[in-house]
Amino acid sequence: MNLRRTLLLFSFIFAGSLAIAQPKDRWTIQDDGAIRWNINDNIPHDDHLEMSGQQLSVVLRYGVDAQKRFHLNRSLVFPMLRMHPNKTQNNLKQRFDVNIPALVTVDDQTLLNEEVRDVTFNGIMRVESSFGYIYRRKELKDAVQLTRVLYPSTNAARYCEEYTFKNSSPNQITLRVPEWNVTYTTPEEAGVYGAYCIEAGLSKSGVFVLKPGETLEFYAVFSGRKLV
């Protein structure tokens, strides 16, 4: 009898330890078929995914740190732009580790204390987060909402990121977006089809005044092409 009780107690303890050790699912399936990562205390966490069009593939290495800030590194692959020696794996490649929202200022200040709310994926990636800024010597939390939408072009050698900033504060704000353009050129002798050009830039720059509830949208575009 004592042996039976001991075995029964052990089985309960063993089953309980398995339940505790088993990690919770980070992603949940939505009604529309998308998967959603609702950011909670299960951070920091890093992950990656690959998306492709006809002329470009992109690997996104992304994550949310312990302070709920989003980070992103992009690896672009251009399969139609071949490099010497002419083998399958020798395509034009380039990484970009730039933080686009960090280029934008609100009332001449850096956006503060990003908090990612959720990440969704249904063929394209969507990231929802919020920032604060200093107003009259105090931080206004959740004052600027940001939506990132990340995807490759289906038929061009181009990868796009949409950025939509919304003024969620009770005050008028001024956003400044810089002119940002980057160009890389490969040596002519390195490419099967000669020299190649990789370009990245913002679709919009300038000073933008947003009243409460108003939005500003612009794109970051990364592309590759032959120079000839």
Placement of each model-derived feature along the sequence:
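Bacterial Sec-dependent N-terminal signal peptides
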Residues: 1-23
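Terminal accessory carbohydrate-recognition/targeting modules of carbohydrate-active enzymes
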Residues: 21-228
